[in-house]
Amino acid sequence: MTGKDEYYNRAKQEGYRARSAYKLKQLDETAGLFGPGNTVVDLGAAPGGWSQVARERVGEQGTVIAVDLQRIKDIDGVETLRGDMTDDDTRERIIERIGEADVVVSDMAPNMTGEYHLDAARSAHLARMAFETALELLGAGGDLAVKIFEGQDVAPLREDME
């Protein structure tokens, strides 16, 4: 074992690429985010931990598209798309591939500066971009799960989402 935390060690033992996989599993268990056969788009997917969980949960009949600026190592049953989800071209490529999604997830984080308010504002911007992308991709009754750093921009974003 390493000196890392429990979830880091567990992720490595169980083959997940990131400890955040457990956050998504817990969310799915409490909110019923995924269903068998769902189509899922994972925005800001690298290194792929959330895509791995989505793949497990939707099964072989489901579709998972992982989108990121960075290259994502292949994941069985997951289609990767390298691109910037804030670009219209990337969103159009996703829509051409799947039509509509049942679930959009985003674990995007900004490049950290160490300045809390700036990092929180950048996180909120990425969350808003994920929300706007989800509006284009989600079918009726679709779900969005997005990670965001707590800050002054969370409340206005939450209001817009509701």
Where are these regions (language model features)?
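Conserved SAM-binding loop of SAM-dependent methyltransferases across substrates and taxa
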Residues: 47-60
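S-adenosyl-L-methionine
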Residues: 70-113
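Glycine-centered, small-residue-biased loops immediately flanking beta-strands
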Residues: 38, 62, 142
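C-terminal substrate-binding/active-site "lid" region of AdoMet-derived donor-dependent transferases
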Residues: 41, 76, 116-120, 124-162
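Glycine-rich helix-loop-beta junction characteristic of Rossmann-like nucleotide cofactor-binding loops
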Residues: 29-36, 56-57, 98, 136
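Conserved class I S-adenosyl-L-methionine
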Residues: 35-46
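Conserved SAM-binding loop and adjacent beta-strand
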Residues: 10-29
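Conserved SAM-binding motif I beta-strand of class I
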Residues: 63-68
